[in-house]
């Protein structure tokens, strides 16, 4: 086996680095026969700087985050770490598509119409050779802030037309910042490895959906998603957007 040191970096929300490590370095190394495997992931812990920064922006929730509801107090910061092992050898789940974009709209606010997010999603679909209707579930970035949720759903509605099941698992993990990319994607991979995704409803008892958002496709009831192509999105500060598609290996 060939082992190679690739790179170490820090990007907002972690998803961009996870994607870049695979697509710009790790993937080509494997395809060229220069490496047998690539390990990619992220980690983050509670620290004063992000806590104070999000508080200064007015988006730090004092309670559990509630993405896509009419009462979105902001983000709840989580703590986490994860690694993924990608190999040339076939495994139960494969990374079939990825897309990334940088819309450069603002340092901390997403582009209101989600054009950059849409470009990343369409890029992932194109690379995977799939159509929007092939995707059985989308794990939204879904931070629970007003601007992020509105921008992301605008993009998803244009791509998927409300026909694809979607929700945000940050309701349960919080926003793990530098670990968010691997946390969000890892939940999907684990589900595919164990026969499907058992997903709770996006809105728990006492939570009211924000009906000003295009919520078609958002899970209002618990669902069992059969194995198939799934997507995870991460939309970071500075307009750094990524989308990953995983599917069972036939």
Please annotate each region the language model reported.
Residues 1-4, 9-10, 148-161:
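Active-site-proximal gating segment of KS-fold condensing enzymes and close homologs
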Residues 60, 64-128, 137:
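Condensing-enzyme catalytic core mediating Claisen C-C bond formation in acyl metabolism
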Residues 132-134, 213-250:
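Flexible, low-complexity linker/loop segments at domain and module junctions
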